[in-house]
Amino acid sequence: MLQEMHKKFESLFDVKADVRAFAPGRINLIGEHTDYNGGYVFPAAIELGTYGLASKRTDRIIQLYSNNFEDTGIVSFTLDELEFNEQHDWANYPKGVVKYLKEEFNDINQGFNILVEGNIPNGASLSSSASIELLTGWLIKQLFNLHLERLQLIKLGQVVENKFMGVNSGIMDQFIIGMGKAEHAILLDTATLDFDYVPAKFGDYVISIMNTNKRRSLTESKYNERRSECENALSQLQQQLEITSLGELSLAQFEKYQSLITDEVVCRRAKHAISENERTKLAHKALADNNFEQFGQLLNASHKSLKEDYEVTGIELDTLAETAQQVEGVLGARMTGAGFAGCAIALVDKNSIQKLEDEVSKAYIDKIGYAPSFYHVGISDGVKAL
């Protein structure tokens, strides 16, 4: 892929690339919709991701091109035109990174050319947007020799999502893409950003990624609505509790005080955030103890909560996860990512992978009318120069 990208770069921009980098995508093993509630998450970076090449220019023009969106052509603007532009589509993500990096580093005083190509399926909820954000930051870091720490770039990526793109997401995606480590997941406390690397070894089992192949736009989904509902629950609980996030409560504490929340729907949203936080801590222990059966049961319980209490699954994700849960050799399955579409994951015996794919595909085609896709990918390092 890189050899072809170098040729494409020269034909597009008439110069050779100076630097190149890779940023992975991610799966979240468990801990869904907990990152903006001050809870724990348990993600891993994956070998699917985004590759990028870049070269400096002598003027102030920035030119961006994606092999994944060839119809868009070269997106061009200057260092003085760093505002969101709907017509610039995917290029708003790198543009946002440039905007906030430029505010922190005076060294960014020249334009540059960037070519990107990703192999994360579009709309799969495997964090292609955070991948391109951190990739852009790492390319610019190399081009201008910036003293840019990983955590600094991670936080900047979240600012791009929140302020530039208008999605009130938490920090999980950027964190795992910035800090990922091959063959390890990260248990991250999103309240403090304390984290542990945890070997992601499942013995005779593997994680299978199952894609609904239904497109979802995060900004237009109910993501922001769910966050607002959780903030509503928190403010009602704060009438009697000195807490700053739902992640500070145990399930037992929540059950004691849940009557403070007047709206039944809002109460269920909070119940998910708090119960999912407990499941994530239990899953960490289960994996450390090689208790894969319990890990699988926690995946199933997570999906049930996301379906019934948080209501972010939908018929496509439910069909994938619930069919997979019934397949012999599968210990557990759940949706991963923001929900509404995208992917589910299953913990499946290596000898049952084909059985899983056959049975889930048949059920999915029967109910939804088109086929899902399946991926088996290794766990990767975080963003890096190549």
Curated annotation (Swiss-Prot):
Cited SUPFAM superfamilies: GHMP Kinase, C-terminal domain (SSF55060), Ribosomal protein S5 domain 2-like (SSF54211)
Site feature Transition state stabilizer, where: R26
Catalytic activity: alpha-D-galactose + ATP = alpha-D-galactose 1-phosphate + ADP + H(+)
GO cellular component: cytosol
Signal sequence, start to end: none
Gene3D superfamilies per the UniProt record, alphabetical: 3.30.230.10, GHMP kinase, C-terminal domain
Active-site residues from the entry: D173
Binding site for Mg(2+): S129, E161
InterPro entries: Galactokinase, Galactokinase_bac, Galactokinase_CS, GalKase_N, GHMP_kinase_C_dom, GHMP_kinase_C_sf, GHMP_kinase_N_dom, Mevalonate/galactokinase
Molecular-function GO terms, alphabetical: ATP binding; galactokinase activity; magnesium ion binding
Enzyme superclass (EC): transferase
Domain of life: Bacteria
Residues the entry annotates as binding ATP: S66, G123, A124, S125, L126, S127, S128, S129
Protein location: Cytoplasm
Pathway stated in the Swiss-Prot or TrEMBL entry: Carbohydrate metabolism; galactose metabolism
EC number: 2.7.1.6
Gene Ontology annotations of biological process type: galactose metabolic process
Entry keywords, A to Z: ATP-binding, Carbohydrate metabolism, Cytoplasm, Galactose metabolism, Kinase, Magnesium, Metal-binding, Nucleotide-binding, Transferase
Annotated binding of substrate, by residue: E32, H33, T34, D35, Y223
Function summary: Catalyzes the transfer of the gamma-phosphate of ATP to D-galactose to form alpha-D-galactose-1-phosphate (Gal-1-P).
HAMAP family in alphabetical order: Galactokinase
Family: Belongs to the GHMP kinase family. GalK subfamily.
UniProt name for this protein: Galactokinase
Organism: Staphylococcus saprophyticus subsp. saprophyticus (strain ATCC 15305 / DSM 20229 / NCIMB 8711 / NCTC 7292 / S-41)
